């Protein structure tokens, strides 16, 4: 079994720096690239990063990299890799994905088929199985991916399974919810800290509020779910349980939090409450049915984070314009509060009524969105009577 692995955390565009910071906080040196963060680590690193990374999509093992301009080079390159260190006899190993960009090899189904053939031949040789007899694939699954960029192939195994945004607490979702990992990333990009009040005035299924509590209380986002690697025979159940137990002990239950989520839709408020209950944070969040225009607060130095309906989520432009204008009017008196608003509407600032201090381009799935950032006037608490 290998002791050290070349690993990558895949990331949505625009969030790479957040994931890089998370990887470093776990104690691993890393290299931030477009769409991914590279790092090295042992089996424990595979477990820890899956369990703890809030803003990443998946953790993958890089099995190898080699030039591949023709199919024979692809076959020989895949065949040369040390598959015996990963795939036990009986393993299922679908070539689940092939991606070819700016390369001579561009037929992705053919890349999948040839890669599969090469892995089969290597395992038949290693396990002394006759070539004419198909390998039985009835054991744990190892999803293999092949990426060819500028004629260089990278072959990977996915350790995660379902994407990391699937935390295991979402009982039901709204029409177009923000993904949990993106919500966690935006919270980390904001200037919110656990000692500040936090309000999501368009909370939907409660994702921002739930992720905020999990960040504040140091709750590992992967504690309530399982991962692909847990089925693999070379990662011991004992080590997995040890890392999970360590994570559970780090939860900080003492912290006092001031987090509120509001939505105009009573049904969404109930869904948000159920999700918070499933996440184990129901006691930390106040959920209310309330219109945006009814939001008031006499607290200071708070943070508003909102993913209001936009694009396909609101069918009429008039409704969008009215909502954004109301947000601008209601948030304006909250001068010490910072506001972070995510939308794909490029005319947001004119509808809201003021220009953002900063704007950050992100992707909510495949949809390009902007995070409009308005920074509050910071005052010391004793200055306010």
What are these regions (language model features)?
Residues 155-189:
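SAM-dependent Rossmann-like transferase core, predominantly class I methyltransferases
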Residues 178-296, 312-313, 317-319:
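Conserved S-adenosyl-L-methionine
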Residues 144-160, 372:
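C-terminal edge-of-domain segments
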Residues 2-142:
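Non-catalytic nucleic-acid substrate-recognition regions in nucleic-acid-modifying enzymes
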Residues 290-385:
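C-terminal catalytic and target-recognition region of SAM-dependent MTase-like enzymes
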Residues 44-51, 162-165, 380-382:
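Short, charged/polar, Gly/Pro-enriched secondary-structure boundary elements
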Residues 100-103, 162-163, 309-313:
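A short, flexible beta-alpha/helix-coil linker loop
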């Amino acid at each position: 079994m290998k002791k050290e692995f070349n690993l990558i955390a895949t990331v949505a565009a625009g969030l790479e720096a957040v994931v890089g910071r998370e990887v470093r906080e776990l104690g691993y040196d890393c290299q931030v690239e477009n769409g991914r963060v590279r790092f090295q680590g042992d089996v424990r690193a595979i477990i820890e990063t899956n369990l703890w990374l809030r803003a990443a999509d998946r953790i993958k093992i890089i099995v190898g990299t080699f030039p591949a301009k023709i199919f024979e080079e692809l076959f020989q390159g895949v065949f040369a890799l040390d598959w015996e260190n990963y795939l036990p006899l009986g393993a299922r190993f679908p070539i689940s994905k092939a991606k070819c960009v700016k390369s001579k090899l561009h037929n992705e189904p053919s890349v999948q088929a040839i890669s599969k053939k090469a892995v089969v031949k290597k395992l038949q040789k290693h396990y002394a199985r006759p070539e004419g007899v198909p390998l039985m694939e009835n054991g744990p699954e190892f999803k293999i991916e092949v990426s060819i960029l500028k004629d260089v192939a990278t072959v990977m195994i996915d350790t995660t399974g379902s994407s990391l945004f699937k935390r295991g607490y979402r009982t039901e979702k709204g029409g177009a919810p923000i993904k949990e990992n993106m919500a966690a990333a935006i919270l980390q990009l904001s200037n919110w800290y656990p000692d500040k009040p936090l309000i999501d005035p368009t909370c939907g299924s409660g994702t921002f509020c739930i992720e905020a509590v999990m960040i504040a209380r140091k709750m590992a986002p992967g504690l309530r779910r399982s991962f692909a690697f847990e089925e693999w025979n070379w990662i011991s159940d004992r080590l997995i349980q040890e890392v999970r137990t360590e994570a559970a002990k780090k939860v900080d239950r003492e912290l006092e939090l001031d987090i509120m989520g509001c939505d105009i839709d009573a049904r969404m408020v109930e869904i948000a409450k159920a999700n918070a209950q499933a996440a184990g944070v129901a006691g930390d969040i106040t959920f209310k049915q309330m219109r945006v225009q009814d939001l008031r607060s006499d607290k200071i130095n708070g943070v508003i984070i909102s993913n209001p309906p936009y694009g396909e989520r609101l069918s009429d432009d008039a409704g969008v314009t009215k909502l954004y204008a109301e947000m601008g009017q209601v948030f304006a008196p909250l001068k010490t509060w910072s506001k972070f608003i995510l939308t794909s509407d490029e005319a947001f600032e004119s509808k809201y009524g003021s220009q953002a201090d900063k704007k950050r381009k992100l992707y909510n799935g495949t949809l390009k969105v902007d995070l409009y950032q308005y920074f509050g006037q910071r005052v010391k608490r004793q200055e306010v009577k």
